[in-house]
Amino acid sequence: MANHKSAEKRARQTIKKTERNRFYRTRLKNITKAVREAAANGNKNAANEALKVANKSIHAMVSRGFIKKQTASRRVSRLALLVNKIA
């Protein structure tokens, strides 16, 4: 247990930050999974809709500081390549 007031505060902040990061990490994983599944099924319309949602959500995570801009661009780019490969 923390002995200093500042250490107690940091412990509280860490708990909040961990919960927030867990939420975004799970959301990112689920969004990516939805796009990949739609692309694997060959459903172009569903894949495009999922890609739009993914693009918006991933860039929102950038603005909140969860992931870096380049990481977001790379993820969206790779998902877009998958969707564009569908005939």
From Swiss-Prot:
Which Pfam family, any one, appears in the UniProt record? Answer: Ribosomal_S20p
**Does Ribosomal protein show up as a keyword for this record?**
yes
Return the annotated region ranges for Disordered.
Answer: 1-20
The UniProt keywords, alphabetically, are:
Ribonucleoprotein, Ribosomal protein, RNA-binding, rRNA-binding
Any one Gene Ontology cellular component term annotated for this protein: small ribosomal subunit
Q: Which GO terms describe its biological process?
A: translation
* Sample GO molecular function, one term: small ribosomal subunit rRNA binding
Please tell me whether the keyword Ribosomal protein is annotated for this protein. Answer: yes
Q: SUPFAM superfamilies given for it? A: Ribosomal protein S20 (SSF46992)
Gene3D superfamilies reported for this sequence: Ribosomal protein S20
The family annotation for this protein states: Belongs to the bacterial ribosomal protein bS20 family.
Q: Which NCBIfam families match?
A: S20
Q: What does this protein do?
A: Binds directly to 16S ribosomal RNA.
What's this protein's name?
Small ribosomal subunit protein bS20
Species in which this protein is naturally found = Campylobacter jejuni subsp. jejuni serotype O:2 (strain ATCC 700819 / NCTC 11168)
